[in-house]
């Protein structure tokens, strides 16, 4: 197991991509601390991880409350040490610049950027002697302008730049900071949407070079690589997990 003896925090760990990441890291020997706002969902994830032989604890946490969020990270670090931080929790806001209120716009940044910044700040101090890894989950919409998602797209673009900046500031500390940018992924929310509108699902898949949506486990596999020593010389990277969609966009826009 490549993460034996490591402790990792996964935000937004109660569902979808975060759930898959938690299960994957635990399956490779990490003690995972999963946090989210829904206690029942967290415990369901924890039960599955324990049933598979993994080590897990849960923390009910709203990452937008940065004071309590950073206190939680510090508490985990003081109790178990901290080797891995996966900033996965996200707010997905809809609305164009003309329509979305400034408050709606800011909510995307509070969760997607402010919480990540605050979490990294504490994690970097905790990891300074641990050769740690921070993985920020961005989005394909951070690589391109996405009409109708002004706040979300802008915040995910900011997250990518923050990742690059943090990687430069921490490289001398032997802490690696990388990003993963998922494309369309078959999360429970996406699955519910497709069930309500099958034609929309077909259209999404048809627009992906690999002709299908990704699975949460496929994102988790990349996070495992970045969290482990397999990527010991990788920092500041942005790895798309999107079935080739980003390359298609680059060709079309070029």
Spans of model-derived segments:
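Conserved glycine-rich cofactor-binding loop
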Residues: 7, 14-15
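Short, small/polar-rich loop/turn modules that mediate ligand/substrate recognition or access, typified
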Residues: 86, 171, 176, 234-236
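Substrate-binding pocket helix/loop in short-chain dehydrogenase/reductase
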Residues: 96-97, 104-109, 204
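Active-site helix of classical SDR
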Residues: 120, 155, 163
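Alpha-helical segment proximal to the catalytic Tyr-Lys
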Residues: 125, 168-172, 232
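Residue(s) in the substrate-gating loop at a strand-loop-helix junction
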Residues: 139
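Short C-terminal tail/terminal secondary-structure segment
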Residues: 144, 224, 235-254
């Amino acid at each position: 197991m490549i993460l034996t003896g490591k402790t990792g925090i996964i935000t937004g760990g109660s569902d979808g991509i975060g759930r898959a990441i938690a299960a994957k890291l635990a399956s490779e020997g990490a003690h995972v601390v999963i946090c989210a706002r829904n206690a029942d969902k967290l415990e369901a994830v924890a039960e599955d991880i324990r049933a598979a032989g993994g080590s897990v604890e849960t923390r009910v946490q709203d990452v937008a409350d940065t004071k309590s969020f950073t206190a939680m990270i510090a508490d985990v670090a003081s109790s178990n040490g901290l080797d891995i931080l996966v900033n996965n929790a996200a707010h997905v806001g809809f609305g164009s610049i003309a329509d979305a209120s400034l408050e709606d716009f800011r909510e995307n940044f509070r969760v997607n950027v402010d919480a990540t910044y605050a979490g990294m700040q504490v994690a970097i101090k905790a990891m300074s002697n641990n050769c740690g890894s921070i993985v920020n989950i961005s989005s394909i919409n951070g690589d391109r302008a996405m009409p109708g998602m002004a706040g979300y797209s802008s915040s995910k673009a900011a997250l990518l730049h923050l990742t690059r900046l943090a990687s430069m500031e921490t490289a001398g500390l032997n802490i690696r900071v990388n990003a993963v940018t998922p494309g369309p992924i078959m999360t429970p929310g996406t699955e519910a949407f497709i069930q309500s509108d099958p034609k929309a699902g077909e259209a999404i898949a048809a627009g992906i070079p690999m002709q299908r949506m990704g699975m949460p486990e496929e994102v988790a596999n990349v996070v495992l690589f970045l969290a482990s020593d397999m990527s010991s010389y990788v920092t500041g990277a942005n790895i798309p997990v999107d079935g080739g969609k980003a390359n298609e966009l680059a060709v079309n826009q070029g």
